Amino acid sequence: MAITEKEREYLESLKEKIEGQLHGSGVKFSDREIEHISLLENRISQKIDEKLLIEKLSSIAKSNDPIDKSLYDKYDVKRGLRNANGTGVLVGLTSIGDVVGYEVKDGQKVAIPGRLIYRGYNVEALIKDAEEHNQFGYEQCAYLLLFGKLPTADELAEFNDLLGVHRTLPENFTEDMIMKAPSADIMNKLARGVLASYSYDPNPEDRSISNVLHQCIALISRFSTLTAYGYQAKRRYYDGKSMYIHNPLPELSTAENFLRLIRNNKAFTDDEAKLLDLALILHAEHGGGNNSSLTVHVVSSADTDTYSAIGAAVGSLKGRRHGGANIQVAEMMDNIKENVKDWSNENEVKSYLEKIANKEAYNRTGLIYGMGHAVYTINDPRATLLRDKAAKLAREKGLEEEYNLYKMVERFSPEILYNMHGDGKKICANVDLYSGFVYSMLNIPRELFTPLFAISRIAGWSAHRIEEIIAGGKIYRPAYKNISAEREYVPIEKR
């Protein structure tokens, strides 16, 4: 596809204008300079041609791929692997985690208070134990998820030592795999770091449980380092800011090391690290049906290597409908704060939320981010725990007005969404509503919100990969109904 005549005339006039200005000052284009202008013209022409071609091909793709929505009902398709009553389609069994938010009675979904269970233990009990003993609890949760039992003091100490040994990245990894190929998106950088780890593993294709466990423990340990270094590279090469590469300390917890690595002075308080540790515990596992954990099961069922399976899970978690939702909450709250003059005025806040739900404000999708969940109905226990902890930190930092704004969003949104949609579905705040606010109060940059989710969830992913290898046995192969008619092939000269 050639450059249009109008575009060519513009380029010619531009060239003549520049040449005329230079002639006026006694300067003329050299043959080499004229050649450069011609090359530039060709490059612009190629870019325009490519853009027009892509637009044309996109139009063809859009016109050929739509599917009549009525066909999903006709063929009883479980879209999103959901049943008509909102429950999930049963595709597997797991003993790792459970997400409880409803019961099914007489075929109907009945709302009940939310519970999050790790290997049979309520996550609230795990958090309470860590707080009572003034200890970091994420590492104990990782042990529990991997091995199905609570560790003794000696077992936990051995496990922490093992994690500490692996926190440092392999020799030359930082220089070759992070600094030489920085990324504007930390989740993409994390996925690449996971895949690159394959090349530094002497036995990457060994699928024995002992080797897979060794690989998973190394990844659990290194995720915080990979994320922090990816962030530092972004600061240097994309943000034009100073880059600080600190060594992780083996004696520190995951939360402590992460705060140490992202801050230029390596400083953090115990309260900051304990609050981040709480967030890591709450995000470590969420059953086998969430998108990224299911991805681990699906990809692992194909008998691929650990790095490919975990890298795929990182890609899933990055999605705006999954782990990326916490950033969307933060952006929505920015919009609310900009457009609501009086944050303490309930009527004004409620009115603006109604505009968002009615597609009249913010991004006009009608979604109030941080509200609603596939399983939780009355409450998301993770959101409840984070909300209570956020209250204390907000008081300490003088951010009570902003905290109360978040609470109003939680309080008003269920009624607003019910009135808008009227489908009878109970809606509660999910963990994303408060997680970003907590991270921002810890002075954690927004681009690290979703990577923090991954730093936590790698423990659950690892447990699900091992479970799939031990108990899976079959490759995932669900059915897709083809709805296109057969056609007679047409030779190219007759099309």
What are these regions (language model features)?
Residues A2-R495:
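Non-transmembrane, aqueous-exposed alpha-helical and coiled segments at domain scale
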